[in-house]
Amino acid sequence: MSLSVTRENFDEWMVPVYVPAPFIPVRGEGSRLWDQQGKEYIDFAGGIAVNALGHAHPALREALNEQANRFWHTGNGYTNEPALRLAKKLIDATFAERVFFCNSGAEANEAALKLARKYAHDRVGNHKSGIVAFKNAFHGRTLFTVSAGGQPTYSQDFAPLPPDIRHAAYNDLNSASALIDDNTCAVIVEPVQGEGGVIPATNAFLQGLRELCDRHQALLIFDEVQTGVGRTGELYAYMHYGVTPDILTTAKALGGGFPIGAMLTTQDYASVMTPGTHGTTYGGNPLATAVAGKVLDIINTPEMQNGVRQRHDAFIERLNTINVRFGMFSEIRGLGLLLGCVLQTEFAGKAKLIAQEAAKAGVMVLIAGGDVVRFAPALNVSDEEIATGLDRFALACERLQAGGASCG
């Protein structure tokens, strides 16, 4: 018999780095979840932009079960068919010529930064080690990636941090230009800052970074962990902008809920990563790559990408209608199905409170800092689920505006 557990057990047994919602989801189907008490939620959080095809998608379950009935793991001393097939699909669909598989976005970014440093050291010299990143970015929780993230809240307790990382202002080319020089080995940037507030880069900013990197022989890394795999209405956001990076990192939606990450790059840059320079025990696991291969098959189609753009319009229209009623947002921004509602000054700092009220109303949303409510739903969310979920979100806004919720 299974052990009966409650939300209170989390506080008793788990390391307290999270404060989960007061309910425990136990079942999902499409863009709906149900908790232990049977309450239904429309899921506009998507596991933080992970569940790109919703919960328990039949094709993903079939791919997972088929591979699970064969074998689960061998380690990196052997390759496997699902990993090779997925690598070829990613290469055929992007600028990349080489792929490194891992288990998360943080690991993919760690690999990208290590590759950039090694390439610069091998081709130029050890003095070329500088990394330029951006304030309020998020690249993961390893010591290297959290240092690149530019959010002191996440890194200040873990000093000394890796050196030679400097942070420019996002969407400010002059700020970046002042830091990028001949000692810079890499520039790492999110095409849309997700955790930093759902802020899309401008075309001029990304194009300018491309030109600065070319001028100073630095590698341009696009962190597409959150924007990748169809989220913005293109398979990867660099395609939306028409700016090609030297290295791209991807995770989250790539596995549709099954943990996987990948670093994509060219043959020239990959060539410096010789046997033993980097590795991972689980990266390229056949279970993960079998599922991810099916995710790509479904998402990398014109129909799916056109659908994301149409759903974007539906969200924007309804969110604008909600804002006309309640006047809570100063801006609604984002690309595709990564959207952020920026709170007006009178509601500043209450994004978490709105998310909590939304859950009470039966819809799950995210935050991006204290002032932005974030939406990252499944890419195949239905029109009915959009309508129902945003009706519930409107109810949460109404309750908050009426004073039915408090910061306590």
UniProtKB/Swiss-Prot annotation:
The modification N6-(pyridoxal phosphate)lysine is found at K252. Its EC number is 2.6.1.81. One of its GO terms (biological process) is arginine catabolic process to glutamate. The keyword Transferase applies. Pathway: Amino-acid degradation; L-arginine degradation via AST pathway; L-glutamate and succinate from L-arginine: step 3/5. Transmembrane segments: none annotated. NCBIfam families: arg_catab_astC, argD, PRK01278.1, PRK05093.1, PRK12381.1. Belongs to the class-III pyridoxal-phosphate-dependent aminotransferase family. AstC subfamily. Catalyzes the transamination of N(2)-succinylornithine and alpha-ketoglutarate into N(2)-succinylglutamate semialdehyde and glutamate. Can also act as an acetylornithine aminotransferase. This is Succinylornithine transaminase. The gene is astC.
